[in-house]
């Protein structure tokens, strides 16, 4: 999963859409006071194509992926640093940060641009599958030798 933000649109009849605005959370959003609202998930996404070159579901503009909100007690799988793997067996819940450059979960960071949130660390694995995206070809493949964590948000 990747962190997402959620904003309530302005109360105008000309907005042209109903519902909240959801988008990918980035580290520069911390300055504006945004918080992580949830994480994107693959399961339950419909009509997202996979191809032999790109076996990971990819959605273009206008398509949708599901997301789960923080506080719903859902368990999600996220890419994590080896420092998070080292936390296996420690007490829960814990504070974590999101490394937006490497798109991975890291132990809590005191950096002013850190995206920090609380979660329960359920399980870690050093041989999990995460998405590897190639900016040049536009293909996404599974990296099956990555560190992953199952967290309850």
Q: Where does each model-flagged region fall?
A:
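Surface-exposed, low-hydrophobicity beta-strand/loop segments enriched in small/polar/acidic residues
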Residues: 1-153
């Amino acid at each position: 999963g990747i962190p997402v933000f959620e904003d309530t649109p302005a109360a105008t009849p000309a907005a042209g859409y109903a519902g909240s605005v959801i988008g990918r959370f980035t580290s520069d959003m911390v300055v504006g006071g945004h918080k992580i609202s949830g994480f994107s998930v693959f399961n339950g996404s419909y009509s997202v194509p996979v191809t032999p070159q790109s076996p990971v579901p990819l959605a273009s503009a206008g398509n949708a992926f599901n997301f789960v909100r923080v506080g719903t007690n859902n368990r999600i799988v996220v890419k994590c640093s080896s420092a998070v793997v080292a936390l296996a067996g420690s007490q829960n819940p814990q504070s974590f940060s999101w490394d937006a450059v490497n798109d991975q979960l890291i132990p809590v960071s005191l950096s002013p641009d850190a995206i920090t949130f609380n979660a329960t660390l359920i399980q870690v694995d050093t041989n999990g599958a995460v998405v590897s995206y190639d900016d040049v070809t536009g293909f996404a493949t599974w990296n099956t030798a990555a560190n992953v964590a199952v967290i309850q948000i």
